[in-house]
């Protein structure tokens, strides 16, 4: 993670700041309360509630560190006004060579922090993401995957 720059939109930055604030205030306070209540139940070595609360605390602290890293190491980007081509933050519908157009997969071109729930993510620096940038609907795109050269057709952009 060191030195990594996260390209995100202003909206995502604001969302991350709000999540960080929520986790570092309400989240930590509530988790401390749950840990203390579980501690009062007795022997900690066999206390499932206590161990679950401590596990949750670890995951929450990891998320806080992750958000903090993104906030400290971000570059704001704006989506280009050219809706006819794939841009940062576009959702692209692609089909692999020889597949039917209605058998598409959707990829969000951007950061995992911005990912809409219903789609996969392709980083703009990944082989697929970089190959799709600036391309238009109907174009055939080649990119190198671990299994070799793959060809996809862009069937939709939103």
Give each language-model segment a name.
Residues 3, 39, 45, 71-72, ...:
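Residue-level signal for pocket-adjacent positions within structured domains
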Residues 2-59:
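N-terminal cationic and glycine-rich segments that engage phosphates or anionic surfaces
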Residues 10, 25, 43-46, 73, ...:
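Generic structural "secondary-structure junction" signal
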Residues 23-26, 34, 38, 63, ...:
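Conserved, well-folded catalytic cores of nucleic-acid-processing
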Residues 8-13, 66-67, 105-106:
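Short amphipathic alpha-helical segments, especially helix-boundary/capping motifs
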Residues 77-153, 158:
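Non-DNA-binding regulatory cores of transcription-related proteins
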Residues 48-80, 84:
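Internal alpha/beta loop-helix hairpins
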Residues 18, 25, 30, 40, ...:
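General N-terminal targeting signals
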